[in-house]
Amino acid sequence: MALPLLEYKPTTQNQRVQSFGTADVNEDTPYIYRLENANSPSEIEELIWAAYRQVFNEQEILKFNRQIGLETQLKNRSITVKDFIRGLAKSERFYQLVVTPNNNYRLVEMSLKRLLGRSPYNEEEKIAWSIQIASKGWGGFVDALIDSTEYEQAFGDNTVPYQRKRLTTDRPFSFTPRYGADYRDRAGIVRPGRMSNWNNSANQNYDGVAILGVLLAISAGMTFLFVLNWLGISSSF
């Protein structure tokens, strides 16, 4: 049984404040792709790739991640941009690349950025949506976001989601890594603490080898002198 979405208090973010047209002339404001403005095959291709950049991220736009069936339906206008975004987010490739390596809290953060164009309001919202993932599954969570009133008011049926009212000092959402620090730890990537410990042990090993080399050199020198001394005594007889 799916649990209802817990209540949370939205905080003030840029996309909730009227811009008075200032954001429209800001060079960092993203170009808004709308299906009704795509009147040529090249313009539809640009819209499709904008959707891939938004959902899959800049670093994950690879040929084998393409969803040709969804692209064809969109080009034929048999589905809306909203349906195309939904299909990309629920595709097997997206699940393997993004969903599998992450926990529910990071999935909520990434999904709000990629599908709703904003960051989470607070930890309460992240907890509320993470419960939806646990109770409805990934597909149900995606449907809940895309069918939400916020998505409808922000993008409607035929607008590609975008980062709403980004400041020049903000990192673009399209460059957000697909996995967090916990995945890097599980993947076995060496952390700084472990690297320093390894360096310390390595330095200790190098010191031991150096000392052993010096002792061997001294021993060899003493042996050589002993042999020379013995040969000198033997020749005197």
From Swiss-Prot:
Family matches, as InterPro entries: PBS_linker_dom, PBS_linker_sf, Phycobilisome
Q: Which residues form the PBS-linker domain?
A: 11-191
User: Which Gene Ontology CC terms are recorded?
Assistant: phycobilisome; plasma membrane-derived thylakoid membrane
Which parts of the chain span the membrane according to its record? 208-228
Q: Which UniProt keywords apply?
A: Antenna complex, Membrane, Photosynthesis, Phycobilisome, Thylakoid, Transmembrane, Transmembrane helix
Q: Please list which residues make up the signal peptide.
A: none
List the subcellular locations.
Cellular thylakoid membrane
Name the domain of life this protein comes from: Bacteria
Record's function text: Rod linker protein, associated with phycocyanin (PC). Linker polypeptides determine the state of aggregation and the location of the disk-shaped phycobiliprotein units within the phycobilisome (PBS) and modulate their spectroscopic properties in order to mediate a directed and optimal energy transfer. Forms a supercomplex with tetrameric photosystem I (PSI) and PC that allows efficient energy transfer from PC to PSI. This protein seems to be in the middle of the PC hexameric rod and may anchor the PC rods at the periphery of PSI tetramers.
- This one is known as Photosystem I-associated linker protein CpcL
Q: Which organism does this sequence originate in?
A: Nostoc sp. (strain PCC 7120 / SAG 25.82 / UTEX 2576)
Name of encoding gene: cpcL
